[in-house]
């Protein structure tokens, strides 16, 4: 027996039903907010992720790369390890004439995991807002993400906020090298005692500020204002990112959005430049995003600010209850026929499909529990329509009567 690749998953019919359900809710939400759908290729040049320094060396170690042979001059390509960077490249290639671009997409990303315990292929639903730099733009993306999750039936979504520039401003006072800053931040998150002791001795005011940010979880702009007041002389470099952070949470306060300020949630801040947000449902990390104002110019494009987010389909799929998809099951129609009525069965099935309803021919072994209705063609003028959910049956003479009934019309 041939096994699937380690770290990869098959999506079975029930998984795909949930996949499409989540995707449709996300897509519908995006369209109503003015976002337009795009799709980027699975393969991108490795240079897209290396030349601009958009991904850390640690992340680049996890990409799948290989030579795209063209004689001996082939370039190295990768299976995309990220959704935002290709979307930014797409904007530079094809959409620069748009001053403001709202883009959304579904994409799979690939990241190597040596253990094989984590998934190496993950599906994401992404949205990017390009050309606007304001707290209101950040709030729009956060609200869109929360709205999508609410429509999926998740009531208690935890929103955690951090700020990339604030993290960088703190770390810059400890280590000027950007790559080393990522390591130090990981050490801080892991509670490295030696590092904390060194910091307390060498930079006591910065230590107090950092300790306050790392150990406390604020829920309002006043928390950040208190941090600024307590930072003292160490707060000079922190003032600008703190003010930007305060402006962002002020907008969320006005909109009545609940959140938690958690600097530690900013892990993985590679190309972010401002507010970073993460979304949790029952403790499960289901999405996140932030502001990346320098990414597009880093890739050779215009000086355009941007922000975006992704929802993690692989994590959402097992969290969707079948009852949440009741309407999708209810709309599936099973078509049966007796005797020599195959052609009539095809006719009624096509009429049902023209109404935008799924109609499938019955074969032995089909599980009727997956369908809302069954239509049995007994003759050209005799149709038995069964509500499989309510277990009620009605006999009709005309195809039009069947269509009226399945469409919820009272004329039948």
Swiss-Prot record:
GO biological-process terms attached to the record: histidyl-tRNA aminoacylation; L-histidine biosynthetic process
UniProt-listed InterPro entries: aa-tRNA-synth_II, aa-tRNA-synth_II/BPL/LPL, HisRS-like_core, HisRS/HisZ, HisZ
The entry's keywords: Amino-acid biosynthesis, Cytoplasm, Histidine biosynthesis
Other notes: This function is generally fulfilled by the C-terminal part of HisG, which is missing in some bacteria such as this one.
Function: Required for the first step of histidine biosynthesis. May allow the feedback regulation of ATP phosphoribosyltransferase activity by histidine.
A single MF term (Gene Ontology): histidine-tRNA ligase activity
Lineage of producing organism: Bacteria, Bacillati, Chloroflexota, Dehalococcoidia, Dehalococcoidales
Domain of life of the organism encoding this protein: Bacteria
Signal peptide: none
Keyword Amino-acid biosynthesis: yes
Assembly: Heteromultimer composed of HisG and HisZ subunits.
Family the entry assigns: Belongs to the class-II aminoacyl-tRNA synthetase family. HisZ subfamily.
Name listed for the protein in its UniProt record: ATP phosphoribosyltransferase regulatory subunit
Pathway given in the UniProt record: Amino-acid biosynthesis; L-histidine biosynthesis; L-histidine from 5-phospho-alpha-D-ribose 1-diphosphate: step 1/9
GO terms under cellular component: cytoplasm
Protein location: Cytoplasm
């Amino acid at each position: 027996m041939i096994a699937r690749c380690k770290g990869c998953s098959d999506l079975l019919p029930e998984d795909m039903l949930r996949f499409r359900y989540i995707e449709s809710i996300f897509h519908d939400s995006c369209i109503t907010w003015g976002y337009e759908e795009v799709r980027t290729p699975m393969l991108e040049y490795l240079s897209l992720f290396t030349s601009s320094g958009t991904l850390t060396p640690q992340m680049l170690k996890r990409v799948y790369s290989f030579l795209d042979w063209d004689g001996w001059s082939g370039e190295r390509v990768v299976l995309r390890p990220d959704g935002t960077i290709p979307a930014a490249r797409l904007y530079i290639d094809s959409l620069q004439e748009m001053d403001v671009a709202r883009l959304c997409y579904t994409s799979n990303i690939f990241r190597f995991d040596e253990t094989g315990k984590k998934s190496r292929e993950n599906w994401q639903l992404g949205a990017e807002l390009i050309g606007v730099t304001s707290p209101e733009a950040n709030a729009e993306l956060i609200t869109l993400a929360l709205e999508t999750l609410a429509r999926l039936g998740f009531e208690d979504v935890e929103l955690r906020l951090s700020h990339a520039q604030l993290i960088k401003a703190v770390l810059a006072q400890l280590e000027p090298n950007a790559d080393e800053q990522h390591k130090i931040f990981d050490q801080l998150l892991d509670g490295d005692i030696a590092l904390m002791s060194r910091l307390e001795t060498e930079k006591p005011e910065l230590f107090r500020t950092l300790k306050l940010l790392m150990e406390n979880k604020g829920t309002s702009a006043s928390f950040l204002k208190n941090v600024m007041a307590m930072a003292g002389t160490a707060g000079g470099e922190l003032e600008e990112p703190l003010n930007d952070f305060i402006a962002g949470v002020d907008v969320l306060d006005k909109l009545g959005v609940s959140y938690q300020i958690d600097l530690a949630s900013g892990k993985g801040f590679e190309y972010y430049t401002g507010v970073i947000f993460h979304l949790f449902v029952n403790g499960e990390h289901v999405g996140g995003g932030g502001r990346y104002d320098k990414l597009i110019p880093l890739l050779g494009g215009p000086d355009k600010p941007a922000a975006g987010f992704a929802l993690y389909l692989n994590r959402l799929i097992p969290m969707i209850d079948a009852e949440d998809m009741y309407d999708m099951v209810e709309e599936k129609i099973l078509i049966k026929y007796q005797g020599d009525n195959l052609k009539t069965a095809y006719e009624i099935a096509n009429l049902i499909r023209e109404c935008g309803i799924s109609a499938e021919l019955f074969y032995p072994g089909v599980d009727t529990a997956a369908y809302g209705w069954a239509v049995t063609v007994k003759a050209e003028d005799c149709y038995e329509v069964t509500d499989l959910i309510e277990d009620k049956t009605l006999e009709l003479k005309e195809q039009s009567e069947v269509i009226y009934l399945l469409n919820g019309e009272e004329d039948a």
